[in-house]
From Swiss-Prot:
Protein residues bound to substrate: 145-149, 156-158, 202, 263, 294
Family per record: Belongs to the arginase family.
Subunit details: Homotrimer.
A GO CC term assigned to this protein in UniProt: cytoplasm
Residues binding Mn(2+) 2: 143, 145, 249, 251
EC number(s) given by UniProt: 3.5.3.1
KW Metal-binding (keyword) present: yes
GO terms (BP aspect): arginine catabolic process to ornithine; urea cycle
Catalytic reaction list: L-arginine + H2O = urea + L-ornithine
Protein's UniProt keywords contain Metal-binding: yes
Organism: Emericella nidulans (strain FGSC A4 / ATCC 38163 / CBS 112.46 / NRRL 194 / M139)
Designated name of the protein: Arginase
Amino acid sequence: MTSPSTIKQRFLSKPNQLGVVAVGFNGGQCKLGVEAAPMALVEAGLLDQLRDDLDYEIHYDNTVHYYEKEIPAEDPDHRGMKKPRAVSAVTETLSSQVYEHSKEGKFTLTLGGDHSIAIGSISGIAKATRERLGREIGVIWVDAHADINIPEMSPSGNIHGMPMAFLTRLATEEKKDIFGWLQEEHKVNLRKLVYIGLRDVDRGEKKLLREHGIKAFSMHDVDRHGIGRVVEMALAHIGNDTPIHLSFDVDALDPQWAPSTGTPVRGGLTLREGDFICECVHETGNLISMDLVEVNPSLEAVGASDTIRTGCSLVRSALGDTLL
């Protein structure tokens, strides 16, 4: 039996209230199944655990959003991007949904879906935080991949490898129906972005990370310094006066712990290292929102329940669950 967090939340006016958006969207990549993750997480008892064990008042519309009405019949490639209009329309709608929760000072949890949905969740959080607090957000992106491909650089054309490029405005697009809706108010400052867990980074992304001085901790850094020191350095980079959004892709974890994901990469974080990152970010009192993405229950029949359990554990840890 756990109990509610005693950490004072610095940037949430309603810290015991949790706004949840369930996003059943797979259009940022090519594998079916990731759209089933929000329902699987809810059915595994995630929201019940947050309510019963951690005492959150949950604001959830009991709906997994598949956004069928937003998805156009015709969606030809643009600048090499696959399904650009679908991803743009879905993330624009999601941005508004997340904004509505966040502007009230609630913690906002977005359950994906593939990682392209972060274009929606993070833009909504950034806008709400600028309006509510007059501050920029910091983003901690825990992932095997940097997801900062500019469309023309992307080897695959899958938009789940591009969200950070659009959110930081390294990639821009004039067309209203292809991310032209993203404005300055939605932007993430490159100096307030930190990566943890990287180990499969495209050549063009490495160049961008270096050129822009983006703070990134690869698995090499985790091996060298230990996860404790890495998290300490990541948080120091963002600073203690910044509201934090945590975007957690389960493929940051080694496939041993999260096998059911679309792009697994060996040599990743352990389950405890993943939970530890979430625990430490919670302990700052600065965490205002989180995404959990890329759980794909249709891959690896045996591994699906393990991966769902892992996802639940990460979210609980970020929301104040402790071992003792």
